[in-house]
Amino acid sequence: TPEYQTKDTDILAAFRVTPQPGVPPEEAGAAVAAESSTGTWTTVWTDGLTSLDRYKGRCYDIEPLPGEESQFIAYVAYPLDLFEEGSVTNLFTSIVGNVFGFKALRALRLEDLRIPPAYSKTFQGPPHGIQVERDKLNKYGRPLLGCTIKPKLGLSAKNYGRAVYECLRGGLDFTKDDENVNSQPFMRWRDRFVFCAEAIYKAQAETGEIKGHYLNATAGTCEEMMKRAIFARELGVPIIMHDYLTGGFTANTSLAHYCRDNGLLLHIHRAMHAVIDRQKIHGMHFRVLAKALRMSGGDHIHAGTVVGKLEGERDITLGFVDLLRDDFIEKDRSRGIYFTQDWVSMPGVLPVASGGIHVWHMPALTEIFGDDSVLQFGGGTLGHPWGNAPGAVANRVALEACVQARNEGRDLAREGNE
């Protein structure tokens, strides 16, 4: 229905559609709109008992992709009433639930969603957000530093705590449980929580700075997850963590509500994201998963590194980094942003750069991500030839040097590692 005027309250979706040979774009686009809203495979008499005009998804625009004759972008508008308030789970079940297995399509990818304020306002969003986090930690004007404790699996709780202490003592703000550290036979969660809390308090006392360790509360059941979160709060630690895709949006949103009520920061890891977002023609782009997380709730989320990747990737990555941090993001196709997104007053999420980065990337990282980010060096800290603490010191010194140079007006991108 090309004559349809989108409403401010509609949820808009941009799909990259690859139809089967012989299926016209209009038909494929309409099929996507119907299957992800009110349609079924045949006309049913109960359709007469409701006003389909009011409730059906509409494909309102189709645009060809330059250089791809078999693909195009289909824009679909969904009426707000199709979705349960405050449920990312329901949003995804509706929009991407069934339609991706559709016979008439060879492949389908959800590139972007426009979430109207009327819908985003039904979510709590991040437990605290960027500003409140800085106030809690008393750290301003620079990116935060983190480090994932390696080897990720196999350390005893006592040795794990020791590694945490050394990194924090050396000058990092945070250390992190790996995403797959939950509660395994060699290190049960309660032992880990206790030893990490000890490490945090010792490092805080010795450095006079607030420290944290992302205690991974992800578990096999929601009840067990909450039990871990509650234990972390009782220990008085500042931050916990969750794997939001493997744990699920329902669990994540519950945890985010608990974190706001109890003053815990929530670090989010995106384990499993590549299963969904890796393919260029099928699945969902990470910017959609990032928007969903901002609604569901998290104070940090992993967002890739940019460094060492292609230049084109940089704009796309910064596009969804801004979607996480800013209140208002203009439509900009060169950055992969298909819709203008207005978050109104929903708190922002700190993007976490993590994975294969080390101290020589520091100038590039501070220049690309700016102050509102968490830079995480795992092997880049623990792999230091002299040990964890000197590795942490090296990272902190490099960061402070880069920030100082930038504040003095030097161009980090040009001067690089000198």
Curated annotation (Swiss-Prot):
Group of enzyme by EC: lyase
Main location, first listed in the record: plastid
Reactions catalysed according to its record: 2 (2R)-3-phosphoglycerate + 2 H(+) = D-ribulose 1,5-bisphosphate + CO2 + H2O; D-ribulose 1,5-bisphosphate + O2 = 2-phosphoglycolate + (2R)-3-phosphoglycerate + 2 H(+)
E.C. no: 4.1.1.39
Record has Transcription as a keyword: no
Localisation per UniProt entry: Plastid, Chloroplast
Site note Transition state stabilizer, residues: K309
Family: Belongs to the RuBisCO large chain family. Type I subfamily.
Protein name (database record): Ribulose bisphosphate carboxylase large chain
Organism: Pinus virginiana (Virginia pine)
Organism lineage: Eukaryota, Viridiplantae, Streptophyta, Embryophyta, Tracheophyta
Gene name as annotated: rbcL
